[in-house]
């Protein structure tokens, strides 16, 4: 059904609004006879090469790190081909087809090698639900378990992501590991709680050595000692605990208002 799928979305949201001739749109037909698909894929690769290669490749990223329909396990030398879609990819595509039962079991996709030969690659990811896989793609060693991680091998690849999708990246979640920080009260609390998790110690048991061993020596400099930093964070957290509203039903709480932003 030509009204469904990713190409229909591209047509409705992009191609119908720009001045591009239909003959300059090269897509993968969904009705190719099975016996012609291999030849079609070979010819598609030749057409890309004849056109001078792909100038800009724009991608999304699936929940398992797939780019295009290159599922986990795809090798970096893969080219345009027919693939069987796994259950995760079919769920990702559900919104394009209206219902999971409408999603095809197979698809033609550009291969990893084809994508990496593009002059520029841009990957888009938005939302908190993409945070874990974005971190894996950017910060872990490139590997077949996360095909998007192969973009680390490209000389001109960019990830365009919002703050929610970037939320688990070290530079966002634990910035003290990679740069000097502007130590706001909230960031100090987050760093000290993280240090407690790493050392398996309560706040008031943290030592100067703990701070130094885990890259938080800046806080020792800022507060002169682990003791001072510990006390500050302990008191900050303690003051976020409130019993308000409390007391008897209909009791007058006029003289003990709660802060709008206790944390």
Where are the model-predicted features located?
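Conserved phosphate- and dinucleotide-binding cores of soluble alpha/beta proteins
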Residues: 2-26, 31-249, 253
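N-terminal low-complexity segments that are often proline-rich with Ser/Thr-Pro
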Residues: 251-262
């Amino acid at each position: 059904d030509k009204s469904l799928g990713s190409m229909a979305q591209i047509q409705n949201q992009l191609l119908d609004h720009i001045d591009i001739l239909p003959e300059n749109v090269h897509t993968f037909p969904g009705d190719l006879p099975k016996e012609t698909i291999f030849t079609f894929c070979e010819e598609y690769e030749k057409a890309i090469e004849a056109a001078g290669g792909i100038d800009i490749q724009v991608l999304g990223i699936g929940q398992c790190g797939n780019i295009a329909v290159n599922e986990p396990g795809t090798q970096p030398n893969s080219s345009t081909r027919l693939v069987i879609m796994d259950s995760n990819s079919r769920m990702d595509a559900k919104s394009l087809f209206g219902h999971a039962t409408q999603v095809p079991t197979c698809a033609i996709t550009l291969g990893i090698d084809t994508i990496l030969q593009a002059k520029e690659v841009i990957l888009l990811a938005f939302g908190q639900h993409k945070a874990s896989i974005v971190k894996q793609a950017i910060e872990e060693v490139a590997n077949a378990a996360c095909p998007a991680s192969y973009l680390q091998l490209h000389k001109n690849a960019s990830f365009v992501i919002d703050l929610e999708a970037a939320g688990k990246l070290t530079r966002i979640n634990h910035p003290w590991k990679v740069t000097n920080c502007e130590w706001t009260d909230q960031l100090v609390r987050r760093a000290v709680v993280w240090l407690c998790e790493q050392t398996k110690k309560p706040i008031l048991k943290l030592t100067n050595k703990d701070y130094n061993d885990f890259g938080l020596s800046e806080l020792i400099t800022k507060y002169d000692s682990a003791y001072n930093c510990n006390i500050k964070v302990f008191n900050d957290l303690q003051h976020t605990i409130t019993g308000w509203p409390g007391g008897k039903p209909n009791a007058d709480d006029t003289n003990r208002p709660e802060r709008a932003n206790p944390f």
